[in-house]
Amino acid sequence: MESKATASGSFLENIIGKPVYVKLFSGILYQGKLESIDGFMNVTMSQVSEHYEAEENGTLHKYPSEVFLRGSQVLYISEK
């Protein structure tokens, strides 16, 4: 039996390797390159900067290595 990708699955597959925003329920916004994502919305990113609520609020932290975000904390993912 052949499975079909959902619209959200296609979107997520298409943005791997691209710049994205990932916002957590805590209000922290991560901006960086999406390296991987799984079915639980666990996210790995590189070249990441961390902001509170919006990019305009300034950078809280820049990460020199990859960042892992737990899917249960992800509010949304958007393409930059």
UniProtKB/Swiss-Prot annotation:
Gene3D superfamilies: 2.30.30.100. InterPro entries: Lsm6/sSmF, LSM_dom_sf, Sm, Sm_dom_euk/arc. GO terms for molecular function: RNA binding. GO terms for cellular component: nucleolus; P-body; sno(s)RNA-containing ribonucleoprotein complex; spliceosomal complex; U4/U6 x U5 tri-snRNP complex; U6 snRNP. It is found in: Cytoplasm; Nucleus. GO terms for biological process: maturation of SSU-rRNA; mRNA splicing, via spliceosome; tRNA processing. Keywords: Cytoplasm, mRNA processing, mRNA splicing, Nucleus, Ribonucleoprotein, RNA-binding, rRNA processing, Spliceosome, tRNA processing. Pfam families: LSM. Residues 7-80 form the Sm domain. Coiled coil: none annotated. Component of LSm protein complexes, which are involved in RNA processing and may function in a chaperone-like manner, facilitating the efficient association of RNA processing factors with their substrates. Component of the cytoplasmic LSM1-LSM7 complex, which is thought to be involved in mRNA degradation by activating the decapping step in the 5'-to-3' mRNA decay pathway. Component of the nuclear LSM2-LSM8 complex, which is involved in splicing of nuclear mRNAs. Belongs to the snRNP Sm proteins family. SmF/LSm6 subfamily. Component of the heptameric LSM1-LSM7 complex, which consists of LSM1, LSM2, LSM3, LSM4, LSM5, LSM6 and LSM7. Component of the heptameric LSM2-LSM8 complex, which consists of LSM2, LSM3, LSM4, LSM5, LSM6, LSM7 and LSM8. The LSm subunits form a seven-membered ring structure with a doughnut shape. This is U6 snRNA-associated Sm-like protein LSm6. It comes from Kluyveromyces lactis (strain ATCC 8585 / CBS 2359 / DSM 70799 / NBRC 1267 / NRRL Y-1140 / WM37). The lineage of its organism: Eukaryota, Fungi, Dikarya, Ascomycota, Saccharomycotina.
